[in-house]
Amino acid sequence: MFDEEFSMRRKPQAVTEVICSGTTHIHYENIANRKESTYMAQNIPELYGSLVFNDKVMRSKLPKDMYKALKKTIENGTHLELDVANSVAVAMKEWATENGATHYTHWFQPMTNVTAEKHDSFISPTGDGQVIMDFSGKELVKGEPDASSFPSGGLRATFEARGYTAWDPTSPAFIKDGTLYIPTAFCSYSGEALDKKTPLLRSMQTLDKEATNLLHIIGNKDVKHVNTTVGPEQEYFLVDKELYKQRKDLVFCGRTLIGAPAPKGQEMEDHYFGALKPRVAAYMHDLDVELWKLGIPAKTKHNEVAPAQHELAPVFDTTNVAVDHNQLTMEIMKKVADKHGLVCLLHEKPFEGINGSGKHNNWSMSTDTGVNLLDPGKTPAENTQFLVFLVAVIKAV
């Protein structure tokens, strides 16, 4: 099955080189010089979220009444009227085309462990053989991709092809690679969830309702909503692309299947929080920039325990937004690594004998008044609230 370069004679050397490749092929030209770094630091607020249809953009692009109606839908889940959807669609299209987008896609998360997207252009033919750029509220709110080729978890027969994508207005649209990405849920004609986001959104709604009722019972009447929050810490390995190509198991499986261990592993634990190698630092710098453009709050970066292992940790966010951000993060990590002559491995256990890659979620609940319900308080009343919710979580888990 494997070719000669993946023979038993080659394996020990290849595994050693792959794991210990963090110091090879240093490309100093990828590291921004002092002047460029200073400029970047001064302009991060301007850069951050520059490719996101966020609240700032909505406020500037939408009429005041339409903006208020959309915010009401986002915050309270009220029905979105067609005239509001049309107004939002026009504003989205104008903003997207101003930023170079020519297409839009309903971006969803089927039960395949990867995201899915179908790109449609904004063009609409006119009677004189020309085209105009058009985008309607109906196209924004609902799509109809062929669902027959996506797994359904046994919910329905394979010939039942109809599936719908429904806009999730609580997760901001964004631009990537010249396309306007619209986060959506994916469900069947009769409402069965065909993705991983629909159950998440439904669980968030249920928890919001029940947690708010519980807070009212124990005397906290000011709370109107309870959101769940997540801050997924993404661990990963970086290996040299040329060494990666020598290992067919890495290429096909994303992990090693056979081979000898590296001569040095994590015994001394000197890699954890160690100084970043120039090539890795350059990669992390470019990754931060790409993530910040998409409004992903990448906060912390450091070496992990295993050789060639690293971690990126964002600031926590509302759960469905954080999940969307994590899907984007994993995709962008691989793309940026390729530009640096590296390969980013996201498998949970790519190498035997050293640490695998976990993803701490840092799940919690917070009220619309800014209180973390899993944060112990300083008074008996606050501690009572904390203990009630802590016990409820332990009971549920």
Predicted regions and their residues:
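Acidic, Ala/Val/Gly-enriched low-complexity intrinsically disordered segments
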Residues: 3-5, 14-18, 29-32
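Basic polycationic patches enriched in arginine
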Residues: 9-10, 34
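Short, Lys/Arg-enriched N-terminal segments with co-localized hydrophobic residues
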Residues: 20-39
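Short, intrinsically disordered, charge-balanced linker/junction segments flanking boundaries
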Residues: 35, 155-158, 396-397
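N-terminal-biased segments
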Residues: 37-55, 81, 277-297
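N-terminal flexible segment immediately upstream of the FAD-binding catalytic core
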Residues: 37-65, 179-180, 303-312
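Active-site core of metal-dependent hydrolases
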Residues: 45-160
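Glycine-rich, acidic/polar active-site loops that bind/position phosphate-bearing ligands
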Residues: 161-346, 354-397
